[in-house]
């Protein structure tokens, strides 16, 4: 089971992601893989992401 990126806090809309906002957790359904954390630092979320929410590819601007 691979870990996904999960919000460690409420991330407001248009906020650039930092390491402290995220944690790796095994969740279902899977979201952005935890190994992509270095790649998504500095990318903005396109919606508010509540604490404990799995980050999905469509929540992060320019995540392919």
UniProtKB/Swiss-Prot annotation:
Give the top-rank taxon of the lineage listed in the UniProt record for this protein. Answer: Eukaryota
Q: What is its main location?
A: secreted
Q: Which PROSITE patterns match?
A: AFP_LIKE (PS50844)
**What tissues harbor this protein?**
Detected in blood serum (at protein level).
Q: Does the keyword Secreted apply?
A: yes
Localisation: Secreted
A GO cellular component annotated for this chain's UniProt record is:
extracellular region
For whether the record's keyword set contains DNA repair, the answer is: no
Q: What does this protein do?
A: Contributes to protect fish blood from freezing at subzero sea water temperatures. Lowers the blood freezing point. Binds to nascent ice crystals and prevents further growth.
Q: Please give the family membership noted in the entry.
A: Belongs to the type-III AFP family.
What is the protein name for this chain?
Ice-structuring protein RD2
Q: What is the protein's species of origin?
A: Lycodichthys dearborni (Antarctic eelpout)
Ranked from the top, the taxonomy reads: Eukaryota, Metazoa, Chordata, Craniata, Vertebrata
């Amino acid at each position: 089971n691979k870990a996904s990126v999960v919000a460690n806090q409420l991330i407001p809309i248009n906020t650039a992601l930092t390491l402290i906002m995220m944690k790796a957790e095994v969740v279902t359904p899977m979201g952005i893989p935890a190994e992509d954390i270095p790649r998504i630092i500095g990318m903005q979320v396109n919606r508010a992401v509540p604490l404990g929410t799995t980050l999905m590819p469509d929540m992060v601007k320019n995540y392919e």
